[in-house]
Regions:
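Hydrophobic alpha-helical transmembrane segments of membrane proteins
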Residues: 1-67, 83-209
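Short helix-to-coil transition segments within interhelical loops
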Residues: 73-78
């Protein structure tokens, strides 16, 4: 499975580099308003979305071709491992992007936001659950449309939250909300993985979907 992840990184190293750059540089854009804690929250939300919106997506794009599918089918790995590798790649990307954003914020003196990091983590669990679920159940084209819709929904949500003044960062830090949100997102992510494995197990190489 690690070899599959290594393959994705090597074949898509430009997008992996973009993920790193966005995660590191996003706090710089908000450095001018370092006293406003709400902006620190948006650093995590917008930064994590932008950082994670292309790397795994381009990896799925490569795997959606008939030639790549034949190659993957010839590997001595189970199809469940092929699916799990994509979900693990997504998980590693979200951890890396949030970690790099936190480090960059700390260096700039913005002080990493626990609330922002947690909200970004919960969002990305849902993001990959939906995107990868659509990819393995359908195809890359539909998954990419879903990716665009999720991006637009996120931007609209940030705008609405900012306009209404709803302190999502204060709500999510409450133990009840935090545990409920974390548990729900993990279950959705796990369910997406489970059903994607079942769907891909019945997929025949060469199918056009």
């Amino acid at each position: 499975m690690l070899q599959l992840i290594k393959k994705d990184i090597l074949f898509n190293w430009k997008w992996a580099l973009l993920l790193v750059l966005v995660a590191v540089l996003m706090p710089v854009l908000f450095f001018i308003d370092r006293e406003e804690t709400r902006f620190i929250l948006w650093v995590y939300i917008i930064g994590s979305v932008l950082a994670n919106s292309h790397f795994v997506s381009k990896s799925c794009y490569m795997d959606d071709s008939a030639q790549t599918r034949r190659f993957l089918a010839s590997l001595p790995v189970r199809r469940a491992q092929l699916v799990a590798a994509k979900y693990l790649l997504g998980f590693l990307c979200m951890v890396a992007s949030i970690g790099l954003t936190s480090l960059s914020s700390f260096v700039l003196g913005l002080y990493p936001s626990v609330q922002g990091a947690l909200i970004a983590f919960l969002y990305l669990l849902l993001y990959y659950a939906v995107f990868l679920g659509v990819f393995f159940h359908s195809n890359y084209s539909n998954a990419e449309k879903t990716n665009t819709a999720l991006m637009m929904l996120t931007i609209m949500s940030v705008f609405v939250l900012d306009r209404t003044g709803l302190r999502l960062d204060e709500m999510i830090i409450e133990p009840t909300y935090m545990l409920a949100g974390l548990g729900t997102c993990i279950m959705i992510f796990a369910a997406s993985l489970f059903f994607s494995v079942r769907s891909f197990d019945h997929f025949q190489v060469g199918d056009s979907r």
